[in-house]
């Protein structure tokens, strides 16, 4: 039996765990200091009543013979939920076919599981700084990783370089951790680059609900959807 040698290339601990340990040590040494936390985020408000009511109703249905149900009829998720997602996107000018919508257990899992579709010889392009999951998933698979600087010089929004080739590129907008957000025109440039390089864009839109300024993109699909080379994880 052989272990996956690439696991030894991972950092010793998850970034946010390291930050938590450093914060705890600093607090112990400086109990009178207030700390502004810029590490991993967490919820700060209770769930809306409409959400908790729906959860209670779903649990009650599972306790009655008439409404009990087991596995979801479709591997793509409940149709009523996929339909709601379709309507949500349509409200922002993006038309999606129901067959294109897949409900999973979350974007974090998708970002790793999607990689099973691609050979380990593919080169991956990620922004720097970066959400650690993008890097760790590919390190464990043994893929080559290229970094593109996201700094004040480019407003923390790296743009494609025609001299750089990659097979998979990760874009997060609004970005984690910088908060920078691509415009529709900037994403058009990324789509053009992806087509020219026969590459796939993995677009992490986990924070799109914070976009309110006109001209900023809420979805990669806002860019000429036909023949688009991208997958989005909201």
Please report, for each region that a protein language model flagged, where it lies by residue.
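A short helix->loop->beta-strand "cap" motif at the edges of active sites that frequently abuts
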Residues: 196-199
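N-terminal small-domain helix-loop-helix segment of the aminotransferase-like
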Residues: 2-105, 113
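Conserved beta-strand scaffold positions in the cores of enzyme catalytic domains, especially
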Residues: 35-37, 145-147, 229
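Acidic-residue sensor for enzyme active/binding pockets
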Residues: 42, 208, 232
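Walker B catalytic acidic pair
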Residues: 205
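Generic enzyme active-site microenvironment
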Residues: 202
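Conserved core of the PLP fold type I
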Residues: 65-194, 208-222
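Single conserved hydrophobic/aromatic residue that forms the stacking wall/gate
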Residues: 227-234
């Amino acid at each position: 039996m052989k272990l996956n040698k690439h696991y030894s290339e991972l950092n010793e601990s998850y970034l946010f765990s390291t930050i938590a340990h450093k914060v705890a040590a600093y607090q112990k040494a400086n109990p009178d200091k207030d700390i502004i936390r810029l590490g991993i985020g967490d919820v700060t408000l209770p769930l809306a009543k409409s959400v908790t009511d729906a959860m209670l109703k779903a649990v009650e249905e599972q306790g009655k013979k008439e409404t009990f149900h087991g596995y979801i009829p479709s591997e793509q998720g409940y149709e009523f939920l996929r339909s709601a997602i379709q309507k949500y996107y349509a409200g922002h000018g993006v038309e999606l076919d129901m067959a294109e919508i897949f409900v999973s257990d979350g974007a974090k899992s998708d970002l790793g599981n999607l990689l099973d579709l691609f050979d380990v010889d593919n080169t991956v392009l990620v922004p720097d700084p970066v959400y650690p999951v993008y890097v760790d998933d590919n390190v464990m698979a043994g893929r080559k990783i290229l970094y593109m600087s996201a700094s004040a010089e480019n407003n923390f929004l790296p743009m494609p370089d025609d001299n750089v080739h990659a097979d998979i590129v990760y874009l997060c907008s609004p970005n984690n951790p910088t908060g920078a957000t691509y415009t529709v025109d900037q994403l058009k440039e990324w789509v053009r680059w992806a087509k020219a390089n026969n590459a796939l864009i993995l677009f992490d839109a986990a924070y799109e609900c914070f976009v309110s300024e006109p001209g900023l993109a809420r979805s990669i699909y806002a860019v000429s959807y036909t023949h688009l080379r991208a997958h989005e994880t909201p």
